[in-house]
């Protein structure tokens, strides 16, 4: 996933809740190394699980720029590691040693914000979308966790609205993974509806476009209409089959397009 691979927190070698001074210290270290032609690495590069990072002065500056605004800090933090408890310290020691399964086992021992968040990231790294969604539904379904998440990342001074954090998380997943891969694992009804809309709309739009093209043959004779009908059937077959996977056959939206 691009948002993991190129996460600005990862490039700067920090946790999402690391102090700003630590971020700046790592940035300055990078600049010093790069100036003499040396590469620099950090434990949070986790090269055992993600592709190696090609750091440049420009990419380091870009990473800092991406973390300027609180909303961007939160967005990228939704897809990176956080460390707030002694249990996290133990788990990260295993993670850095290449023992991601042991790290996950430790985080599974206690439900808390950092454990859930880190389990989400580990699951996404391993393409374990079922586990990622399961943990995310618990985390994003708990307002206390969300408020704690925001205050841990950006402090308590701001007035950050946490109500849309879940949908922001889902939107990124849909863009990077695809709605169809996520839907089977989702149990939250509002999440299903949100992802369903993102998955269905492009299919409906493509069907409607094909219908509009077919309707342009109206009045051009029976052969033209017959050919248009055959073309419509071919061009919409895959989209309609995909719609069947998202919608029940008695759904108004589906039956309307299927009938057309």
Where are these regions (language model features)?
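Helix-turn-helix repeat elements of alpha-solenoid scaffolds
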Residues: 93-102, 128, 132, 230-244
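Flexible helix-coil transition and linker loops at the boundaries of alpha-helical arrays
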Residues: 146-153, 243-253
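Extended amphipathic alpha-helical coiled-coil/heptad-repeat regions
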Residues: 150-235
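Conserved small/polar residues in nucleotide/adenosyl-binding loops
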Residues: 254-260
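N-terminal J-domain/J-like co-chaperone modules of DnaJ/Hsp40 proteins
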Residues: 1-48, 72-75
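Conserved small-residue packing positions in alpha-helical repeats and bundles
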Residues: 91, 120-123
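Alpha-helical repeat scaffolds
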Residues: 101-107, 131-142, 168-172
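Alpha-helical segment of the N-proximal tetratricopeptide repeat
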Residues: 85-109, 209-231
